[in-house]
Design a protein with these regions (language model features):
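Short, internal strand/loop/helix patches
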Residues: 25, 98-134
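Conserved hydrophobic packing residues within short motifs/helices of P-loop NTPase cores
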Residues: 48-50, 82-84, 130
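Sec/Tat signal peptide C-region and signal peptidase I cleavage site
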Residues: 16-20
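A short beta-strand-turn-helix
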Residues: 27-47
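Sec-dependent N-terminal signal peptides
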Residues: 4-14
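Thiol-/selenol-based redox modules, centered on thioredoxin-like
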Residues: 128-164
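Short pre-active-site segment immediately N-terminal to redox-active cysteine/selenocysteine motifs
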Residues: 45-48, 52-56, 125
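Structural microenvironment flanking redox-active thiols in thiol-disulfide oxidoreductases
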Residues: 61-102, 113-119
């Protein structure tokens, strides 16, 4: 019995670890309701950062503000930042107003049923971000955000882009 439980725990732990390391494609609507294929974004980029957020999440908004600057700095070098909102369907206009008011130019997608978020994270903590390289490998995962984290994230992006 102990062997069986240990084996099941090992298999579950391995499956969770593998899931966290896998990149997978998905399609979500943008703020105008147009379907956007994440696979197409990854195919045309060298490095992509996915960031899951919600309008009620203050650290999420702080991360987005810092990432907007990093996005502008490296987007011409193959970097793409994609913000994926997890608010419910009723909040789409609120999300759109927030993004417009901030002047953000990066793609914002809506994951109102949280399926993509759960597929990547498996947790309910935000912000939750993953950095994906040109080989479509998840090379970094970040949970939460505090001032100063953007320096580490920028260094990871630069390294993935091959910038010294």
């Amino acid at each position: 019995m102990k062997k069986t439980i240990f084996l099941l725990l090992f298999v579950f732990a391995f499956a969770t670890l593998s899931k966290a390391q896998m990149y997978y494609e998905f399609t979500l609507p943008d703020l105008d309701g147009n379907d956007v294929s994440f696979g197409k974004i990854v195919d045309k980029s060298n490095v992509v950062m996915l960031s899951f957020w919600a309008t009620w999440c203050t650290p999420c908004k702080e991360e987005m503000k810092k990432m907007a600057d990093i996005y502008e700095k490296y987007k011409g070098q193959g970097f793409e930042y994609v913000a994926i909102n997890n608010d419910n369907q009723k909040s789409v206009s609120k999300v759109k107003s927030f993004i417009t008011a901030q002047g953000y130019t990066f793609p914002v997608l809506m994951d109102t049923d949280k399926k993509v978020f759960e597929g990547y994270s498996g947790k309910d903590e935000m912000p939750y971000s993953v950095i994906i390289n040109k080989k479509k490998e998840i090379i970094s995962v970040h949970t939460g955000f505090k001032t100063g984290d953007e320096v580490m994230i920028e260094n990871e992006i630069k390294a993935a882009l091959g910038i010294k």
